[in-house]
């Protein structure tokens, strides 16, 4: 029986979503798999819609796994949350789904939010939940830069050097930059992204907002198809996987 769950986690506690052999620390995947084994004594593999990096948070990660036992959805959800009580992981929703459902390959769109604190004073409470950029950013310039990113492009300049994707061509469906007082939220959606594409995109927007180059320079970055041409990689702790559409 296949189950789908919506998961929330605080990413700074983990080495990322995926199990990594030879790396010190725990992954979100391992933590959930361990909770399932404690619940029903069954070893399973949990698959996720987004393989988030170390430090990246999630408020709407979607996973699936197969169980041999049959229980009410709420029983499984409550049991897993019980066994996850000492981890910074929470099962928000859980339901039985068709055997054809796959958390990663069935996904139609992934939604991320990047949170920036644009104030002069250092952060305390949100230190590992937002990127602190003390220099005042020109949000309108950032929005113009974003307009050049939306659509189908070769994003070779916006992917990590170790990205294993065969093609760097992706379609970004939408980018909304919302500024409220000292906080800037960048919402970006696509069916899929290259490794670190969102963080490199945000880093480029921030450099544009600082006045390091004009918004239209993003077009030159795209044309160069070279990681060195784009901006810095924004810190992981400002990024959230917020929703996955199916």
Curated annotation (Swiss-Prot):
- The record's gene field reads truA
- What is the E.C. number? 5.4.99.12
What SUPFAM superfamilies has UniProt attached to this entry?
Pseudouridine synthase
Q: Provide the function of this protein.
A: Formation of pseudouridine at positions 38, 39 and 40 in the anticodon stem and loop of transfer RNAs.
The record's similarity note reads: Belongs to the tRNA pseudouridine synthase TruA family.
For this entry, the protein name equals tRNA pseudouridine synthase A
For molecular function, the Gene Ontology terms on record are: RNA binding; tRNA pseudouridine(38-40) synthase activity
What top-level class of enzyme does the UniProt entry assign? isomerase
């Amino acid at each position: 029986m296949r189950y789908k769950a919506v998961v929330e986690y605080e990413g700074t506690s983990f080495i990322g979503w995926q199990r990594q052999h030879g790396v010190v620390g725990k992954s979100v995947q391992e933590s959930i798999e361990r909770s399932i084994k404690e619940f029903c004594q069954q070893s399973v593999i949990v698959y996720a819609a987004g393989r988030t990096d170390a430090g990246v948070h999630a408020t709407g990660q979607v996973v699936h796994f197969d169980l041999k036992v049959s229980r009410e959805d709420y029983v499984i959800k409550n049991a897993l949350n019980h066994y996850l009580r000492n981890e910074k992981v929470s099962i928000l929703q859980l339901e039985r789904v068709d055997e054809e459902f796959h958390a990663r390959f069935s996904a139609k769109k992934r939604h991320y939010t990047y949170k920036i604190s644009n104030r002069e004073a250092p952060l305390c409470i949100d230190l590992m939940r937002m990127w602190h950029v003390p220099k005042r950013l020109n949000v309108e310039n950032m929005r113009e830069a974003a307009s050049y990113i939306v659509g189908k492009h070769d994003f070779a300049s916006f992917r990590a050097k170790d990205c294993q994707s065969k093609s760097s061509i992706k379609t970004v469906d939408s980018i909304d930059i919302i500024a409220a007082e000292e906080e800037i939220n960048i919402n970006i959606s696509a069916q899929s992204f290259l490794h670190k594409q969102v963080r490199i995109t945000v880093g480029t927007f921030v450099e544009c907002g600082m006045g390091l180059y004009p918004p239209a320079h993003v077009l030159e970055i795209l044309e160069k198809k070279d990681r060195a041409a784009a901006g810095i990689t924004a810190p992981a702790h400002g990024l959230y996987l917020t929703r996955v559409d199916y």
